[in-house]
């Protein structure tokens, strides 16, 4: 799971996956899915093994079910069968329609011992965005707001142009907000927030790519000078 997290920024929209190969109680290979379109975790783990002959007496641990279909890369289940790895331990099933248990069946039909559901909750949580999309057919949504101890989200203002919004966030929590932006593909606010706070909604305090900015506005007449329309806005 820790290995898989290394692919957070590069693997999307694919899931994060980590793989570890163990022989006689010792790790002899490891890998993770670095970027979409590149080799999967199982491939990188196999390639990292110095003595391929040991694979025939090893166990491969993988956080997500090995794929069984041809996409941008060949099936990882086929690679495991080809290398003669006798045991596979899987964290959780892959809900993607082209996999969804087929990888497990392919391994079992080849005579490989397969164990599924080890640290399953942690593996599902790791790819909660991917899992939500393929099981509920909707985006994974995170709600974010800042409020005072007595439940207020802003001071009373009558002129948004002259009166700036009251900042409840600390430097540390602002950094966490930008980390959250880096971990999501889009950020959504309403018309009133766009006018009252004039937010940039871009990424500044954390490495990564700024999310797609979305505004719900029934009127469709937001002024063009708002910061969210300017990529360089600070």
Ranges and model annotations:
Residues 100, 125-126, 223-225:
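Short, charged, surface-exposed secondary-structure boundary motifs
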Residues 1-12, 133:
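Short, basic/aromatic recognition patches
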Residues 21-122, 212:
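Zn2+-dependent cytidine deaminase-like catalytic core
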Residues 132, 140-234:
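Active-site ligand-binding patch in enzyme domains
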Residues 17-25, 144-146:
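Short beta-strand scaffold segments in enzyme catalytic cores
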Residues 13-16, 140-141:
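Short, small/polar residue-rich loop motifs at catalytic or cofactor-binding pockets
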Residues 109-116, 133-143:
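A polyampholytic, Gly/Pro-enriched intrinsically disordered region
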Residues 117-134:
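Short, structured interface segments
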